[in-house]
Amino acid sequence: MKLSRRSFMKANAVAAAAAAAGLSVPGVARAVVGQQEAIKWDKAPCRFCGTGCGVLVGTQQGRVVACQGDPDAPVNRGLNCIKGYFLPKIMYGKDRLTQPLLRMKNGKYDKEGEFTPITWDQAFDVMEEKFKTALKEKGPESIGMFGSGQWTIWEGYAASKLFKAGFRSNNIDPNARHCMASAVVGFMRTFGMDEPMGCYDDIEQADAFVLWGANMAEMHPILWSRITNRRLSNQNVTVAVLSTYQHRSFELADNGIIFTPQSDLVILNYIANYIIQNNAINQDFFSKHVNLRKGATDIGYGLRPTHPLEKAAKNPGSDASEPMSFEDYKAFVAEYTLEKTAEMTGVPKDQLEQLAQLYADPNKKVISYWTMGFNQHTRGVWANNLVYNLHLLTGKISQPGCGPFSLTGQPSACGTAREVGTFAHRLPADMVVTNEKHRDICEKKWNIPGGTIPAKIGLHAVAQDRALKDGKLNVYWTMCTNNMQAGPNINEERMPGWRDPRNFIIVSDPYPTVSALAADLILPTAMWVEKEGAYGNAERRTQFWRQQVQAPGEAKSDLWQLVQFSRRFKTEEVWPEELLAKKPELRGKTLYEVLYATPEVSKFPVSELAEDQLNDESRELGFYLQKGLFEEYAWFGRGHGHDLAPFDDYHKARGLRWPVVNGKETQWRYSEGNDPYVKAGEGYKFYGKPDGKAVIFALPFEPAAEAPDEEYDLWLSTGRVLEHWHTGSMTRRVPELHRAFPEAVLFIHPLDAKARDLRRGDKVKVVSRRGEVISIVETRGRNRPPQGLVYMPFFDAAQLVNKLTLDATDPLSKETDFKKCAVKLEKV
């Protein structure tokens, strides 16, 4: 039988999907499968961004040999982006780590020693000694962990239990602090619950898309393909793109807006003013479902307390707000006139009006999308709150085709970092450590003494760097992240602490990243389908996958590392006597027995796994660890608006969007007929708030922490490119992706280059007040900065752009502003 290439590809996809699901397939497809019968196919979510695409993974002889888009996956419908097609190759880089490595000299650990192979027992021996010494001498606040939005759900849950319940330290934070923390705080302030109310199904029903600091064409290309299809197939659909520089998403834009950095706050308030002045408020929705509050201002920049900007702030770090009347709110935004906004932002008046009209038109369904442009911002929480204002004023929310939508950058920044609660202040299901009732719920569920979980918020990501430098944090374990490259202000605030002899740094990673090479102990880690996992994507979709191959050498999953290390500690070594007296039956037990091998977690037998199903952790322990941890964790959200389905349902489905109630997922939250928590007759209910109403905040423009001046005369913005993911530790080991974009470049306006006697391809030294890097001048290509701004991606380990960035954060979310600092250029 002859097949065209198209037919072959289609049949192959259908056959693979059907085979993975155990279904019969048409004859043509069976013929194709017959040619590949040695390849076994199974489903998994993609390893990269927060879109949550479904892929089919092909394995053969113990290796991942193929990958294709899953045609049954509702997110991507069989399509992958360029990174997704090369997923198998991320696992087999030539420098893959396969055994623990410790800095040693003369046969023992030495901070200045060379990395030397050791066994896992030796690695845990050293870690045990370092942890116990720190806990005994300085207490729980001297240890910490930096985790990841790439952790599986049960890895994040296990880590949070180990630190918050076991070690009694809230000094655990995820790298999602650098990307999604502002979104979290924005959601909590406005709605009282985290995560978007809408879903990707909105795309096919929207009339307008507004991108606020989101280059979806490169960072969320599968979603962008759906938006492109919607725009090009309907002449009445509009796309507006806002950014501080021109990028690939502008190619589809009907209204491409370039604004002065930080002035997005001005535009947001102008649109609110326009809506009011043009009588475009949805009065029925507004009167029933919205409260108005005025937020504290002059809140600082999250820098060290000794920094002049922090000393000058009137209300540093204040999250306070007070009720206000509609007339007061109207007067507040009235200051943001068209003329003032055009002057402050540099955006032509006609473009501003066109943008405002999209929100004001009652007949247009509008989706607002944003990612790091909003979130990595010293007023990122405010930006999130202000975009919610526009949707709440107009009632364009929680309905098909309408709503604000915060896009995530990591595969489980939502499912793990946010929902599990691996932030220094959070517990599962939006609970927080500062709330006694929330701590009590967790302590009872975990069967640990009351008072075990500290009430004090732990160190967030940037504070961890500072504490390491100051010698206050002495044992530090990072997992599934490359913060030495990805975090801000490397020279001043991170490297000094990592290399301080007082501190011991552990890095768990599959590859020798910049972080790993700066550590004292490297633990080789299993990745992606070398373990059973679960991710939660940006639309609240929880997705599972099974282990499909084994990790190379002695590499172990983060879950295995956490659980096995917990065996090294008995309760008497980590808890004071007053806690042990409350539960004397826990004396003499290890943290493994107290946290993981409990009756509730260990009640699911390994026999639930198929005989040929890989699951290294569960088979070693003798019970289905992942299922036990998930079901215990899921209990916290069920009945509270975070309902997750039973564990087994996820292995059968292509993901389910929570809340999942009575077997039915939820596409749109907070609206009657869509959300099971909204009763008939309520219309809308923002049930995260006690009165069921969302909040509109009055928040002003405030300047960036650092701006160009006479000496440092250019804005620097950092970010990503299509071909590489974050620090490139996986994608740069894929030859095809590396060749496509082999090294970072400095995108610059041709006139700015000419004024500095620079030409395309020249080497250039980029200098800030904190450091310098050498890069390559690029005056063409995909990114076109305006005069006065340069853009540089952060994937290149040879060009550590975060030597330049400032560690200023949003004072409320503690998220770093990677988009705005001042630099100068010197020709090399």
Curated annotation (Swiss-Prot):
Necessary cofactors: [4Fe-4S] cluster; Mo-bis(molybdopterin guanine dinucleotide)
Post-translational modification: Predicted to be exported by the Tat system. The position of the signal peptide cleavage has not been experimentally proven.
GO biological process terms on file: cellular respiration; Mo-molybdopterin cofactor biosynthetic process; nitrate assimilation
EC number: 1.9.6.1
Recorded catalytic activity of this chain's protein: 2 Fe(II)-[cytochrome] + nitrate + 2 H(+) = 2 Fe(III)-[cytochrome] + nitrite + H2O
Pfam families for the chain: Molybdop_Fe4S4, Molybdopterin, Molydop_binding
Primary subcellular site in the record, as a coarse category: periplasm
Database matches in NCBIfam families: NAPA, PRK13532.1, TAT_signal_seq
Name by which UniProt lists this protein: Periplasmic nitrate reductase
The organism's taxonomic lineage, starting at the top: Bacteria, Pseudomonadati, Pseudomonadota, Gammaproteobacteria, Enterobacterales
Gene: napA
